[in-house]
Amino acid sequence: VCERHVGRKSTNNLNLTCQWNSCRTTTVKRDHITSHIRVHVPLKPHKCEFCGKSFKRPQDLKKHV
């Protein structure tokens, strides 16, 4: 996730609407949009230590366990 997708508060370029293809999800917090953008990326860095299933976001792993 790069500054171009999320923006920067210090430059008044804070864009809280997802710009990925036709997705237009909007949030009020920067960390929420950063977390949302992860659903568009194929990485799954959060792995269950019990069954080995992997998830894109930590909250998805937490729901699984």
Curated annotation (Swiss-Prot):
Query: What induces its synthesis?
Result: By alkaline conditions.
UniProt entry keywords in alphabetical sequence: Activator, DNA-binding, Metal-binding, Nucleus, Repeat, Repressor, Transcription, Transcription regulation, Zinc, Zinc-finger
Note the InterPro entries from the entry.
pacC/RIM101 (IPR050806), Znf_C2H2_sf (IPR036236), Znf_C2H2_type (IPR013087)
Select a single GO molecular function from the record's annotations and give it.
DNA binding
UniProt-listed GO biological process terms: positive regulation of transcription by RNA polymerase II
Cite the residue ranges of zinc fingers (C2H2-type): 16-40, 46-65
One cellular component term (GO) for this entry is: nucleus
**Purpose:** Transcription factor that mediates regulation of both acid- and alkaline-expressed genes in response to ambient pH. At alkaline ambient pH, activates transcription of alkaline-expressed genes (including pac1 itself) and represses transcription of acid-expressed genes.
Q: What is this protein called?
A: pH-response transcription factor pacC/RIM101
